Design a protein with these regions (language model features):
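C-terminal motif of bacterial Sec signal peptides marking the signal peptidase cleavage site
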Residues: 7-10
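Bacterial signal peptide processing site
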Residues: 12-14
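A short, structured loop/turn motif at beta-sheet edges
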Residues: 92-94
Length: 155
């Protein structure tokens, strides 16, 4: 599967249960759990245009981040998205862009414990999804995260 070949941990790895216990569930999101949507996001190959199913909706602040992987690879610029609760020793208030942080997200190999700088901040609803890439391969389960403007209803 292409996603696993890229070193992605779509379920968020070891940090996932801790993060999901801390983030606030949205009681009445625009896209409810179980809804089918079309992805407009292009975070990963095969994502844009894929059908997805909403498996969670959370109220938080989403950040794009530039970070240096712990694997020694070159810096990753503009990675979308990590959330407030995936920042090590996070505070309740949103951070400003430019803030330097340590990541506790484990979305991709080398992300956990990486140092980074927040590029953008957006207080929003984020969604966890299951989807099958348009490029083929198996279903990606519990992918974190897409924002409301990155999905649209199935017509």
């Amino acid at each position: 599967m292409l996603i696993s070949a890229m070193g992605l941990s779509a379920c968020g790895g070891a940090a996932a249960p801790d993060v999901l216990e801390q983030v606030e569930i949205v009681p009445k999101p625009t896209f409810t759990v179980g809804s089918e949507v079309i992805l407009k996001a292009s975070h990963q190959p095969g994502m844009q245009g894929a059908k997805a199913k909403i498996v969670g909706a959370y109220d938080t602040t989403a950040y794009s981040v530039t970070y240096t992987p712990t694997t020694g690879e070159p810096p990753v610029k503009g990675y979308k998205w990590i959330i407030q609760e995936e920042i090590k020793n996070h505070i309740k208030q949103p951070y400003n862009p430019g803030t330097e942080v340590v990541l506790k997200a484990d979305h991709v190999k080398g992300m956990l414990d990486a140092s980074g700088k927040l590029d953008t901040a957006n207080t929003t609803t984020v969604y966890m999804i299951d989807y099958t890439p348009t490029t083929g391969g198996g279903e990606v389960k519990n992918y974190k995260w897409v924002t409301e403007d990155e999905i649209s209803p199935v017509k």
